[in-house]
UniProtKB/Swiss-Prot annotation:
EC number annotated for this UniProt entry: 5.1.1.3
Upper classification of the organism: Bacteria, Bacillati, Bacillota, Clostridia, Thermoanaerobacterales
Signal peptide: none
Reactions this protein catalyses: L-glutamate = D-glutamate
Organism: Caldanaerobacter subterraneus subsp. tengcongensis (strain DSM 15242 / JCM 11007 / NBRC 100824 / MB4) (Thermoanaerobacter tengcongensis)
Active site residues of this protein: C73 (proton donor/acceptor), C181 (proton donor/acceptor)
Designated name of the protein: Glutamate racemase 2
A Pfam family this chain is assigned to: Asp_Glu_race
Length: 264
């Protein structure tokens, strides 16, 4: 047994969709969640900025004595060198690519993500490393994250943005669409309605949460015997984050702590 918490971080509220899946699979674990609400979105940031931000956040997580860190941000996964950190890191992008490979029947996979993730070609590279025959079609949807951060993921504006973005996949005959940004599952009902029944919409957090569980079991560092607790930290706006977190997780949150992340 190991009662140390699991760290989860994202540029904002998107990683809460990953946290929700983790809680479902590992309800007895404690969690430290960090949302970089001061510097969201990451999609248009430079490689150097994202590497700096990730280093600061991972240092913060180490100070919190976490036993593993879940990078719940595809843009970060697509940008940083994960090998340089001396802590167990879980990669939502890798889990998403693997899910897409195992879901597709016709070997035609779509990916929607931030501009930086698409430009990195990380999904395409990861998918083709498993099965080179799969055709990968990618589309950046930069309008999604600002809408979701404002809580407008069920709005008419969100529907219009999704319809415009997903138009790209018409005629491509994809049977699988990967939500390549952890914010996007909050728009999943809209995305599914637009894509129709013939396309399987993949949330990478489903596979990722089971990978974390398997690692904890294998390493014999599971926590058990009590209901887990969650501590929330942000770098900027705490009130909007608190509202969003309560909506996504379906539970009341007592406090969100603001941390000066740049000192790490």
């Amino acid at each position: 047994m190991d009662s140390r918490p699991i760290g989860v971080f994202d540029s904002g509220v998107g990683g809460l969709t990953v946290l929700k899946r983790l809680i479902q699979v590992l309800p007895e674990e404690d969690y430290i969640y960090f949302g970089d609400t001061k510097r969201v979105p990451y999609g248009d940031r430079s490689k150097e900025e994202i590497e700096l931000f990730a280093g600061q956040i991972i240092n913060f997580m180490k100070e919190k004595n976490v036993k593993a860190v879940v990078i719940a941000c595809n843009t970060t996964c697509a940008t940083i060198d994960k090998g340089k950190y001396d802590i167990e890191l879980f990669d939502v992008l890798k889990a998403g690519a693997e899910s897409g490979v195992y879901c597709t029947k016709n070997k035609k996979v779509g990916v929607i993500a931030t501009k930086r993730t698409v430009e990195s070609r990380s999904y395409e590279i990861n998918i083709k490393s498993i099965n080179p025959q799969i055709e990968v079609y990618q589309k950046a949807c930069p309008e999604f994250v600002p809408l979701i951060e404002k809580g407008l993921y069920n709005s008419h504006l969100a529907y219009k943005a999704a319809k415009d973005c997903l138009e790209e996949f018409k005629g491509k005959e994809i049977d699988t669409l990967i939500l390549g940004c952890t914010h996007y599952p909050l728009m999943e009902p809209i995305i599914k309605a637009i894509m129709g029944d013939g396309v399987k919409v993949v949330d990478p957090a489903v596979r990722l949460s089971h990978e974390v569980k398997e690692y904890l079991e294998r390493s014999r560092i599971l926590n058990f015997g009590k209901k887990g607790k969650i501590e929330f930290f942000v770098s900027g706006d705490a009130e909007n984050f608190k509202r969003a977190a309560e909506m996504v997780l379906g539970k009341k949150i007592d406090e969100v702590f603001i941390v000066d992340i740049e000192r790490y």
